[in-house]
């Protein structure tokens, strides 16, 4: 069989490499790195030992637009992309994962849930606060419902003008810092997961309190707390999305959140690699830097390869999400 093949390469088939940033993305990432190096790095050890984030650093994150990267200016946001949010999370985690996780949860979980599911009234009431002044928390986990998230025991009861919440949430990131909470509770246990509904709870609502803060082994400046609901009254209009559709909000928002976690770990790994590389150049044995030993070079090379592989997976998942392409599998891979 004779066939003729064209030797001309069509440049229209060449797409932008995953790790090549646009000018806007590059400038944004550089500005976040500069902020992290200059204003966060000097306080990382202090915050970890105190197990508390410095309020002025969080205030600066709001000032720089890092707490609301995707929402438009009409909501006080930066009008950026999900990928840019991941760049910010990565650059912050490179210096301090505690600040990074706070920014991550606010962007990829809380704000995304409002953007995708909130009524116009809830968006207008809460998005400007989340973008400009108030940290959010995403409250799904309970003592008996971790991996099986929909086995939650927190209950909601319809009282007419209000819902009444009773129960306890565990291991909630930003628990101490947050003022706005997305809380998942079951309004009708007989319906199973179809009874789960998402509610917007504010810190000052009657019957709501923040409980014990976990004493963690790492990322200690980021608070991880329990939340207590004792006849907590929530206004009827504070249902996020539709009644009984909380499971859908939880699943789909967590898919985006997995990419954010991947970006956190990517930044942390990059920072660890840079620290290790710097140490090998300073540490001397047998009259030379240990970086000159081939065995050490092998280890550094392996580290660099793994970090770059992780970057490819995280960036790919984030860009797929922005392109409105299927990304669930890639998000799970990025988190791993």
PLM segments and residue spans:
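Alpha-helical interface subdomain recognition
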Residues: 1-105, 117-122, 133, 146-149, ...
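Short Ser/Thr-interspersed hydrophobic loop/turn segments at strand-loop and sheet-helix junctions
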Residues: 65, 89-93, 185, 201-206, ...
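Short beta-strand-to-turn element immediately C-terminal to the catalytic PLP-Schiff-base lysine
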Residues: 116-118, 157, 183-187, 200-202, ...
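A short, Trp-centered hydrophobic/proline-enriched beta-strand micro-motif
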Residues: 132-141, 184
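Short Gly/Pro-enriched turn/cap motifs at secondary-structure boundaries
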Residues: 144-147, 171-174, 188-190, 216-223
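A short core secondary-structure module
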Residues: 150, 162, 166-210
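Flexible, small-/acidic-enriched active-site or ligand-binding loops
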Residues: 151-153, 206-235
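Long, acidic (Asp/Glu-rich), low-complexity accessory segments flanking structured domains
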Residues: 230-249
């Amino acid at each position: 069989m004779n066939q003729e093949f064209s030797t001309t390469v069509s440049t229209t088939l060449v797409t932008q490499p995953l790790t090549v940033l646009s000018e806007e993305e590059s400038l944004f990432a550089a500005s976040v790195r500069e902020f992290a190096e200059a204003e966060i790095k000097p306080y990382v050890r202090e915050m970890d030992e105190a197990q508390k984030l410095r309020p002025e650093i969080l205030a600066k994150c709001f000032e720089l637009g890092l707490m609301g990267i995707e929402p438009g200016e009409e909501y006080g946001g930066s009008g950026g992309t999900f990928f840019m949010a991941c760049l910010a999370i990565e650059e912050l985690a490179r210096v301090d994962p505690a600040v990074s996780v706070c920014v991550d949860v606010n962007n990829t979980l809380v704000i995304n849930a409002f953007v995708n599911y909130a009524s116009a009234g809830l968006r207008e009431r809460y998005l400007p606060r989340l973008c400009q002044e108030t940290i959010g928390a995403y409250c799904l986990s309970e003592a008996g419902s971790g991996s099986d998230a929909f086995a939650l025991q927190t209950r909601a009861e319809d009282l007419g003008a209000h819902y009444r919440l009773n129960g306890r949430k565990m291991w909630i990131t930003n628990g101490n810092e947050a003022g706005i909470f997305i809380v998942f509770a079951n309004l009708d246990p007989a319906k199973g997961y179809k009874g789960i509904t998402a509610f917007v709870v504010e810190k000052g609502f009657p019957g709501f309190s923040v409980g014990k803060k976990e004493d963690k082994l790492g990322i200690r400046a980021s608070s991880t707390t329990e939340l207590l609901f004792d006849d907590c009254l929530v206004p009827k209009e504070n249902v996020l999305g539709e009644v009984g559709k909380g499971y859908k909000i939880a699943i789909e928002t967590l898919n985006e959140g997995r990419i954010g976690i991947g970006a956190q770990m990517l930044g942390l790994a990059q920072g660890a690699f840079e620290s290790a590389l710097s140490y090998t150049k300073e540490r001397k044995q047998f009259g030379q830097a240990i970086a000159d030993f081939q065995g050490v070079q092998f280890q550094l090379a392996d580290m660099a390869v793994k970090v770059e592989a992780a970057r490819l997976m995280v960036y790919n998942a984030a860009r797929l999400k922005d392109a409105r392409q299927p990304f669930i599998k890639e998000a799970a891979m990025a988190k791993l």
